């Protein structure tokens, strides 16, 4: 089929002939190849792809084939279904098998199915995040933004489809997974037979994802730090290119700062992070003013340059944006302020290194603060006294490499004498100890499943609200790498 560029006239003709559902499908199918493109409609999408040299008659035919507009293949592109199918068998595709799979699943669901799926994912996306009248593809996009669904991460979707008794669609997912694993196995075999083969690819991309820092958010957030959607990059890297991993070899791995204003979980938090290889710095029951001094002191420590990471555990009364010391000052201490003190600008010795935050706050019922978005607070950065020299020629974004796990629960949990330990911190410790050689993000997804399971068996007042936001650029494993 012709690889020649597509004229504006042809793009206009195609766009005029598509209905709204077909336009939605085409925009969805192209999400992997439209990184950094703001394409609000199909015409702009196709025009942008054409300008980038990614749209030819062959790729446009592929898109029309995927949305089943075989009539337009013949009328506008002067080709037919059989010719397109033959071309796809012999040539690389514009659209990933992953996108095709999700589109086909969406076509097989009726509105009741979609409504049930939206309901089942509320504990992951946040209640009210996705309107009930949204389509399946809208739901998928939201789950992708939260990093709950990806080409290699379909467990949540399988679980939800099983709950609505659509086992037939799970079969499609299983076939896709087996096919992907088979392709990866074949590629690894090929690479093993060619040990001197040098593979070059865009250094901004690792495992199909952009290395530019963007906050991946699990759970609802009313404000968004970065407007760009979190999604798979436009480049499809060979499956055998391994994702880059953070260096975690220093002894200790880094300082683990524990500020505990409650005291119920201190012992096993110390044991957990000590077992991971961190040097523990514990502060029990500090006042709010003391917290400020503690955080400033550790943000300016020169020792960070000798370590590969930093961890911080905060346990207190508070909400999703602040914590209180022993004196319970009403305004509390800003969690954004804590995060900003350890960014690459204010703590250069930690630039490019993972900075982990695990937060358990207890709040009065109904007093939850505005939202749990992790945002930059410029003025607060200026208050830090740290003055290390800025590294030269550093290209790492200052907000990169942050892992922010925040759990809130009702303060009534602390009134139970026999079970006042945090379910979140207990299960977090178990996950970190048992799965230390697995990626931290994967462990946290499983942690969210466990907290969800707990929530499903208790009253609303006993439930935990857990969210994860991160700007990790590489795979993070809390073990020597």
Swiss-Prot record:
Keyword Disulfide bond: no
Region (Interaction with CASP3): 197-436
Region (Interaction with CASP8): 6-200, 372-481
Region annotation (Interaction with CASP8 subunits p18 and p10) ranges: 219-481
InterPro entries (UniProt xref): Caspase-like_dom_sf, DEATH-like_dom_sf, DED_dom, Pept_C14_caspase, Pept_C14_p20, Pept_C14A
Pfam families (alphabetical): DED, Peptidase_C14
Domain DED: 6-78, 97-172
Keywords, sorted A to Z: Apoptosis, Repeat
Region (Interaction with FADD): 6-229
Gene Ontology BP terms: apoptotic process; necroptotic process; negative regulation of apoptotic process; negative regulation of extrinsic apoptotic signaling pathway; negative regulation of extrinsic apoptotic signaling pathway via death domain receptors; negative regulation of myoblast fusion; negative regulation of necroptotic process; proteolysis
SUPFAM superfamilies listed in its UniProt record: Caspase-like, DEATH domain
Residue(s) at site: Cleavage: 371-372, 377-378
Region ranges (Interaction with TRAF1 and TRAF2): 197-481
The protein's assembly and partners: TNFRSF6 stimulation triggers recruitment to the death-inducing signaling complex (DISC) formed by TNFRSF6, FADD and CASP8. A proteolytic fragment (p43) stays associated with the DISC. Interacts with RIPK1.
PANTHER family per the UniProt record, alphabetical: CASP8 AND FADD LIKE APOPTOSIS REGULATOR (PTHR48169:SF3), DED DOMAIN-CONTAINING PROTEIN (PTHR48169)
Role: Apoptosis regulator protein which may function as a crucial link between cell survival and cell death pathways in mammalian cells. Acts as an inhibitor of TNFRSF6 mediated apoptosis. A proteolytic fragment (p43) is likely retained in the death-inducing signaling complex (DISC) thereby blocking further recruitment and processing of caspase-8 at the complex. Full length and shorter isoforms have been shown either to induce apoptosis or to reduce TNFRSF-triggered apoptosis. Lacks enzymatic (caspase) activity.
Domain description: The caspase domain lacks the active site residues involved in catalysis.
Protein name: CASP8 and FADD-like apoptosis regulator
Organism per entry: Mus musculus (Mouse)
């Amino acid at each position: 089929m012709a690889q020649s560029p597509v004229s504006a006239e042809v793009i206009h003709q195609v766009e005029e002939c598509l209905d709204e559902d077909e336009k939605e499908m085409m925009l969805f199918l192209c999400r992997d190849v439209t990184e950094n493109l703001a394409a609000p409609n199909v015409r702009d999408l196709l025009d942008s792809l054409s300008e980038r040299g990614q749209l030819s008659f062959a790729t446009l035919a592929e898109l029309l084939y995927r949305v089943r507009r075989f009539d337009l293949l013949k009328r506008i592109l002067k080709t037919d279904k059989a010719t397109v199918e033959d071309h796809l068998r012999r040539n690389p595709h514009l659209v990933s098998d992953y996108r095709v799979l999700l589109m086909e699943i969406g076509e097989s669901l009726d509105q009741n199915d979609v409504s049930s799926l939206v309901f089942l994912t509320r504990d992951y996306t946040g209640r009210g995040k996705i309107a009930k009248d949204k389509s399946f593809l809208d739901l998928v996009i939201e789950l992708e933004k939260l990093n709950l669904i990806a080409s290699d991460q379909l467990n949540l979707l399988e679980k939800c489809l099983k709950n609505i008794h659509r086992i037939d669609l799970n079969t499609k997912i299983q076939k896709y997974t087996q096919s992907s694993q088979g392709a990866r196995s074949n590629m690894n075999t090929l690479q093993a037979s060619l040990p001197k083969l040098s593979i070059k690819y865009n250094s901004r991309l690792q495992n199909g994802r952009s290395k530019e820092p963007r906050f991946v958010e699990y759970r609802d957030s009313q404000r968004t730090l970065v407007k760009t959607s979190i999604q798979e990059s436009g480049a499809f890297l060979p499956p055998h290119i391994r994702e880059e991993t953070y260096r975690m070899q220093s002894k200790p791995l880094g300082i683990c700062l524990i500020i505990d204003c409650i005291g119920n979980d201190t012992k096993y938090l110390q044991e957990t992070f000590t077992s991971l290889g961190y040097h523990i710095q514990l502060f029990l029951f500090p006042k709010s003013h003391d917290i400020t001094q503690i955080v400033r002191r550790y943000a300016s420590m020169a020792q960070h340059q000798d370590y590969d990471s930093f961890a911080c555990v905060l346990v207190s009364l508070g909400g999703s944006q602040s914590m209180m010391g022993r004196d319970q000052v009403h305004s509390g201490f800003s969690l954004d302020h804590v995060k900003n003190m350890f960014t690459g600008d204010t703590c250069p010795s930690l630039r490019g290194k993972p900075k982990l935050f695990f937060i358990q706050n207890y709040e009065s019922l109904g007093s939850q603060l505005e939202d749990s978005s992790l945002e930059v607070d410029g003025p607060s950065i200026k208050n830090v006294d740290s003055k290390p020299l800025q590294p030269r020629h550093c290209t790492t974004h200052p907000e990169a490499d942050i892992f922010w796990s925040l759990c809130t629960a009702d303060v009534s949990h602390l009134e139970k004498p026999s079970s006042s330990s945090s379910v979140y911190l207990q299960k977090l410790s178990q996950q970190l100890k048992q799965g230390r050689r697995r990626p931290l993000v994967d462990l946290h997804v499983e942690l969210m499943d466990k907290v969800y399971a707990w929530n499903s068996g208790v009253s609303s007042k006993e439930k935990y609200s857990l969210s994860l936001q991160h700007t990790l650029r590489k795979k993070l494993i809390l073990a020597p790498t």
